[in-house]
Amino acid sequence: MNQASAIAILVIFSLASGYLLGSIIFADIFSKILKKNVREFGSKNPGATNSMRVFGLKIGFLVAIFDAFKGFFAFLLTWILFRFGLQGYLTEKVYQSTYFLSYLSCFAATIGHIFPLYFKFKGGKAIATTGGSLLAISLWWFLICLLIWIMITLITKYVSLASLITFFVLAVIILIPWLDYLYFFNSDPLKSITYQNEWYIILFFCLWYWPLTVVVFWLHRANIIRILHGKESKITQLN
């Protein structure tokens, strides 16, 4: 196999596996198991927060965990293929300039959650799936965003507002080269202290994360209107 073929397989596998995994909507799966359609109650969104409203905190928490796992597992599969299969066909120079393409699986997983193949392309808002993707990409991103999300949720009691603010903050911290420490490919703990990412890798993440942020804000347009009018459901109103 030549290098071009190896890179093509990496890109195709990343996008295909990520999208197919992301298309698994666990809120809909629990709907079938519990014989109660989450899309017919509450906000009608097949996501973790509405699952808490409809099915209770335990089921909603499971939906959040499973949705987040999609984003992480999609990357993990791609990383295994790349690390133990395709990498051997690449020179060191080509490897250093292409390994980050593995993270296309994270992008594809979020798109799959929003536009799922198995559910007529009508999915959720990809908050938890994005969280799982961040855990796969950079622990700094994940921890910063998790702390911000928890803080805003506790202060305002609005999960939707916390999610939107967190997405906005992430759109900014992506630009900080010291924070996007791609630990799956940089396993030396000491390197995390002096780490600084390449500009083209930062651009890569911006090119898919910034448009995703716009999509997520659009999907939350009804939530934004309800927040402005003081009609958005608070987390204290969950079961």
Swiss-Prot record:
InterPro entries for the chain: G3P_acylTferase_PlsY (IPR003811)
Mode of membrane association: Multi-pass membrane protein
Reaction(s) catalysed by this chain's protein: an acyl phosphate + sn-glycerol 3-phosphate = a 1-acyl-sn-glycero-3-phosphate + phosphate
Biological process, per Gene Ontology: phospholipid biosynthetic process
Pathway(s) where this gene product acts: Lipid metabolism; phospholipid metabolism
Coiled coil: none
GO molecular function list: acyl-phosphate glycerol-3-phosphate acyltransferase activity
Chief location bin: membrane
Keywords associated with the record: Cell membrane, Lipid biosynthesis, Lipid metabolism, Membrane, Phospholipid biosynthesis, Phospholipid metabolism, Transferase, Transmembrane, Transmembrane helix
Entry EC no(s): 2.3.1.275
Record-level GO cellular component terms: plasma membrane
Enzyme's top EC category: transferase
Compartments where located: Cell membrane
TM stretches of this protein: 6-26, 61-81, 99-119, 135-155, 159-179, 199-219
Tagged with keyword Transferase: yes
PANTHER family in the cross-refs: GLYCEROL-3-PHOSPHATE ACYLTRANSFERASE-RELATED, INNER MEMBRANE PROTEIN YGIH
Function, in words: Catalyzes the transfer of an acyl group from acyl-phosphate (acyl-PO(4)) to glycerol-3-phosphate (G3P) to form lysophosphatidic acid (LPA). This enzyme utilizes acyl-phosphate as fatty acyl donor, but not acyl-CoA or acyl-ACP.
Quaternary structure annotation from Swiss-Prot or TrEMBL: Probably interacts with PlsX.
Record-stated family: Belongs to the PlsY family.
Protein name: Glycerol-3-phosphate acyltransferase
Organism: Mycoplasma genitalium (strain ATCC 33530 / DSM 19775 / NCTC 10195 / G37)
